[in-house]
Amino acid sequence: MARATVVERGEYFLKAVVEGVPPSLVNSLRRVIISELPVMAIDNVVVVNNTSVMYDEMLAHRLGLIPLTTPLQSLPPYEDCVSGLADPSECSTRLTLQVTAEGDTTIYSGDLASDRPDVVPVYKDIPIVKLVKGQSIVLEAYAKLGVAKDHAKWQAATASYYYYPKVVVKSENCREMCKEICRQLENPIECSFNKAWTCKDLCKEGLEVTWDKNKYVFWVESFGNYDVNTALREAFRILKRKFAVFAEELFRRASVETKV
């Protein structure tokens, strides 16, 4: 029976023990989280004036990598934005920056003003560029929904998993030898499979390390665009849609071959 037990969680982080499912399904979820969760990111920049020491291209690149809050509940599905079913204006927004330095100053991500109050920089203290007295920057930046398989600036989260390790300590000396690597050898949450195997190399026959092929420690961490609950909910929605599209195409082709 498939089951997931949460062992650690926060607003943007979750670690769980997953069991009763094949590794292909767990890996599919991991891949969707990493590369197919939609988030807002700056994609086009119109520079009106830039007298700083930074080239326009580098400035635009930095702006693109600033994570933006993404209210998925009030945005159209990403697939509708790509297909044209949704109004393009609902899938994008504008941010502006207009600064003239009165002295030595640093421009931060928090200085960007957004047309949408729910799409703003996640972190306000990301440095963009330094200005000296008299220098100025005036620009418009246009953010849109995207996914990380197209560009890393649209990556919403990272995820990983490892097989649930089964560790048997046969020598107490092994605990002392491994205390710097893993203090709780028999705790698979605190001691990952890789750490346990490193200890195995030290302890030799004093430690037995195997794994459960249908049990995993899975973790996901959001970059702040939205919380981990939203990330998982969207990942499962995308995964279900992929299964539905695959099944529909499979049945269609099977039907065509049967008629022939």
UniProtKB/Swiss-Prot annotation:
DNA-dependent RNA polymerase (RNAP) catalyzes the transcription of DNA into RNA using the four ribonucleoside triphosphates as substrates. NCBIfam families: PRK00783.1. It comes from Pyrobaculum aerophilum (strain ATCC 51768 / DSM 7523 / JCM 9630 / CIP 104966 / NBRC 100827 / IM2). Keywords: Cytoplasm, DNA-directed RNA polymerase, Nucleotidyltransferase, Transcription, Transferase. Its EC number is 2.7.7.6. Part of the RNA polymerase complex. GO terms for biological process: DNA-templated transcription. PANTHER family: DNA-DIRECTED RNA POLYMERASE, DNA-DIRECTED RNA POLYMERASE II SUBUNIT RPB3. It comes from the Archaea. GO terms for molecular function: DNA binding; DNA-directed RNA polymerase activity; iron-sulfur cluster binding; protein dimerization activity. It catalyses: RNA(n) + a ribonucleoside 5'-triphosphate = RNA(n+1) + diphosphate. It is found in: Cytoplasm. Its main location: cytoplasm. Signal peptide: none annotated. This is DNA-directed RNA polymerase subunit Rpo3. It is an enzyme of class 2 (transferase). CDD domains: RNAP_D (cd07030). InterPro entries: DNA-dir_RNA_pol_30-40kDasu_CS (IPR001514), DNA-dir_RNA_pol_insert (IPR011262), DNA-dir_RNA_pol_RpoA/D/Rpb3 (IPR011263), RBP11-like (IPR036603), RNAP_Rpo3/Rpb3/RPAC1 (IPR022842), RNApol_insert_sf (IPR036643), Rpo3/RPB3_RNA_Pol_subunit (IPR050518). One of its GO terms (cellular component) is cytoplasm. Belongs to the archaeal Rpo3/eukaryotic RPB3 RNA polymerase subunit family.
